[in-house]
């Protein structure tokens, strides 16, 4: 049995990075991520309701919204599956954070604060499957000179990070190694090197969870595992459908179309069935409707009708 929480779950991710009482963890991670660029000394968590809400994202995307002492904003996300318009969605989120800084009247001089989007991706991004870290800025197409530093995207493809413990050379790499392998540890590495990992070990120890938090975590891990099972089933169904179509239209063309269609159908049908099943079980156990909606991604109307 795992000793430490799974950071790819909603409860796990937010326990590590989303608690004001333990905000030093997120501060340390951001400083290691942006080492050599800036030094953050404090953050304030913002109301996540300020972010655009898409009910279908719940259950597979978990986000945290905060600002630092200089007023710069950070959106930190964990995403467990790729979406068709993943890049557009990221651009929309950050653009909304920029737009909300506007003030009415002639006195405002467009003195914008930078907005950073940090996206943990627990999957291979289809258009750049082999690159772990991708940094996106607004720059001149010909000279590569930065046009503006007010919008920054950092994509982290976790499956592409393959370093072992003794191969990690920076504190940022140590963070990623710990997050990616957390469930397999009986003790966290790097504690002697950096005190934040000592603090992290205390926070992520499952034995330290209260009874209520443990119940929420157990449901969160169930939703996460069901999601993985749905994806595996969808991929298999897509492969079989693709091969059947390939017999008629050619193996290569048929597999491509069949897999895409099968995966989409499998995701939609399988995920909804799992969400309803999880919500029904949580409702029976007396969970608050808002907690059920947050974990499963269902609307309150759908939950009340169960």
Regions found by a protein language model. Name each.
Residues 1-306:
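Elongated, amphipathic alpha-helical interaction scaffolds
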């Amino acid at each position: 049995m795992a000793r430490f929480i799974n950071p790819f779950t909603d409860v796990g991710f937010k326990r590590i990075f989303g608690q004001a009482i333990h905000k030093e963890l997120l501060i340390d991670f951001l400083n290691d991520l942006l080492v050599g660029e800036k030094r953050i000394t404090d953050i304030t968590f913002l109301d996540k309701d300020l972010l655009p809400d898409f009910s279908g994202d719940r259950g597979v995307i978990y986000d945290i919204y905060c600002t630092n002492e200089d007023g710069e904003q950070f959106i930190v996300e964990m995403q467990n599956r790729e979406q068709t318009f993943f890049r557009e969605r990221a651009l929309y989120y950050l653009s909304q954070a920029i737009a909300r800084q506007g003030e009415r009247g002639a006195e405002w001089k467009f003195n914008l604060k930078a907005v950073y989007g940090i996206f943990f991706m627990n999957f291979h991004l289809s258009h750049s499957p082999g690159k772990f870290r991708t940094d996106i800025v607004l720059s001149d197409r010909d000279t590569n000179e930065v046009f503006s530093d007010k919008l920054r995207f950092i994509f982290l493809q976790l499956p592409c990070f393959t370093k072992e413990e003794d191969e990690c050379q920076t504190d940022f790499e140590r963070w990623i190694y710990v997050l990616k392998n957390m469930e397999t540890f009986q003790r966290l590495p790097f504690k002697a090197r950096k005190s934040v990992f000592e603090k992290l070990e205390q926070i992520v120890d499952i034995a330290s969870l209260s009874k209520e938090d443990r119940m929420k975590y157990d449901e969160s891990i169930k939703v996460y595992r069901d999601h993985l099972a749905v994806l595996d089933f969808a991929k298999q169904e897509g492969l079989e459908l693709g091969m059947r179509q390939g017999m008629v239209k050619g193996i290569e063309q048929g597999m491509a179309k069949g897999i895409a269609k099968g995966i989409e159908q499998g995701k939609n049908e399988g995920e909804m069935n799992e969400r309803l099943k999880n919500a029904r079980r949580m409702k029976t156990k007396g969970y608050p409707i808002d907690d059920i909606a947050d974990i499963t991604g269902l609307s309150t109307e759908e939950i009340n009708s169960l």
